[in-house]
């Protein structure tokens, strides 16, 4: 079953997809993480919502620099406190 997105989630993921399609090919592969920062941002927004997902994405982008080793860095799972 597909999860419906809020209008803000749709807008954020559309902007990121626009970056992936229009800008990223011109820059070439630069991300040192797997998945790339843009895919991470989309997944974080879909998993955690726009505000928290954007926070995770911003922290990830700030780590994406030559002094960080990079590697595998998946989106953390959603902490659902009601089901504990």
Curated annotation (Swiss-Prot):
It is found in: Cell inner membrane. Pfam families: YidD. GO terms for cellular component: plasma membrane. It comes from the Bacteria. It is a peripheral membrane protein. InterPro entries: Membr_insert_effic_factor_YidD (IPR002696). Its main location: membrane. Keywords: Cell inner membrane, Cell membrane, Membrane. HAMAP family: UPF0161_YidD. Could be involved in insertion of integral membrane proteins into the membrane. Belongs to the UPF0161 family. This is Putative membrane protein insertion efficiency factor. It comes from Shewanella frigidimarina (strain NCIMB 400).
């Amino acid at each position: 079953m597909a999860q419906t997105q809020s209008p803000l989630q749709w807008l954020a993921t559309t902007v990121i997809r626009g970056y992936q399609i229009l800008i990223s090919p011109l820059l070439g592969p630069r991300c040192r993480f797997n998945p790339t920062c843009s895919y991470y941002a989309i997944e974080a927004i879909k998993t955690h919502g726009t505000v928290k997902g954007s926070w995770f994405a911003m922290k990830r982008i700030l780590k994406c620099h030559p002094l960080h080793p990079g590697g595998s860095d998946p989106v953390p799972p959603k902490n659902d406190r009601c089901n504990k």
